[in-house]
């Protein structure tokens, strides 16, 4: 796969800066990224890590592993980046960390399946960011029966909007970035009583 043939798969400069700012605000100890691609967003997210923090990045494309590693090694975050190669839906359940920040930018067809798996790894008060949730505006128009990706993103957006344990907003940046704060409503109610 040629990288220049996949422009929508890479976070642009503005989105990269936003990811960095969000990460710096949160000051996470543990970040999980689903969908590494070139590693650009990995490096942007790493800018906010606390000292000794770690970012786990998962990608299924083994052809890009060495490409990513080359740039990670040149960065000041090399020791903080842990690469995982494989199907994210199989890799994530093997992780036992409660993540402060999760960034989802992977296979759109599986966005709905990722939701519960990712929430189980997100600590209360953690933030879930999801890329491409406007999907070039297709989520706002009638959807072709054959358009599986758009259907999946619409379903994902609906699932997020129906959850009472999350505060959700879609930012109209590039192709849409959902920002979710996992409040775990029941935990807050228990603390108030």
What are these model-derived regions, one by one?
Residues 1-5, 182-190:
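Conserved small/polar residues in nucleotide/adenosyl-binding loops
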Residues 8-11:
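N-terminal small-domain helix-loop-helix segment of the aminotransferase-like
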Residues 13-182, 186:
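S-adenosylmethionine/decaboxylated-SAM
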């Amino acid at each position: 796969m040629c990288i220049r043939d996949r422009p929508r798969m890479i976070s642009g400069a503005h989105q990269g800066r936003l990811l960095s700012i969000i990460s710096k605000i949160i000051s996470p100890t543990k970040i999980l990224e689903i969908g590494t691609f070139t590693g650009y967003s990995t490096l942007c997210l790493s800018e906010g890590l606390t000292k000794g923090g770690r970012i786990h990045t998962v990608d299924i494309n083994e052809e890009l592993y060495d490409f990513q590693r080359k740039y990670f090694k040149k960065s000041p975050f090399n020791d903080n980046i842990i690469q995982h190669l494989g199907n994210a839906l199989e890799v994530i359940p093997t992780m036992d960390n409660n993540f402060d920040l999760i960034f989802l930018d992977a296979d759109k067809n599986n966005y709905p399946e990722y939701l519960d798996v990712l929430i189980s790894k997100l600590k209360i008060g953690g933030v879930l960011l999801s890329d491409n949730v406007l999907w070039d505006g297709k989520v706002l128009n009638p959807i072709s029966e054959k358009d599986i990706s758009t259907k999946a993103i619409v379903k994902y957006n609906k699932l997020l909007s129906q959850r009472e344990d999350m505060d959700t907003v879609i930012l109209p940046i590039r192709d849409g970035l959902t920002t979710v704060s996992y409040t775990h409503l029941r935990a807050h109610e228990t603390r108030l009583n």
